Amino acid sequence: MEDKPSSFANSKEWIGSVEVGLVLDQFCNVPCRIVHSRSGSELNQVFSQVFKHFIEKKCPIMMGGDLDCSSKGIFGACEDGKNFYFLVVDPHFVKTSDGITEKNIVDLGWAKWIKLEDFVSSSFYNLCIPQVK
């Protein structure tokens, strides 16, 4: 794709939401929109876009940040009248000897609803939102 220097190949460097969008577009013919939040404390400003995406498109979103450097799969969005939440699935889950069970995924915290106010307030976030048809 030539968006990185040749030294990037076989390195331990990370890719982020922007690169995920490039890969989806280049290899899967799925264009993506990057939505940027300047800080975790401003994620509520992008909530309506994410909520609308799940109503209309129903496909996961990749989310990454700088200081919060753990990538996240966003699989849903909801509100309870006063708080906003994202359903976060950790893409680093590794199948255990028990297989993939609710205990492995939910009870051990690999998938959970997270209040937007609990994201790192000093980290920016990029959300890669696939524009599926």
Place the predicted regions along the sequence by residue.
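Short, exposed beta-strand "edge-strand" segments with a Pro/Gly-rich flavor and a Y/T-containing core
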Residues: 9-15, 77, 107-116
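Conserved active-site-adjacent core of cysteine acyl-enzyme catalytic domains
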Residues: 1-72, 79-89, 93
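Noncatalytic regulatory segments and standalone regulatory/sensor domains
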Residues: 83-133
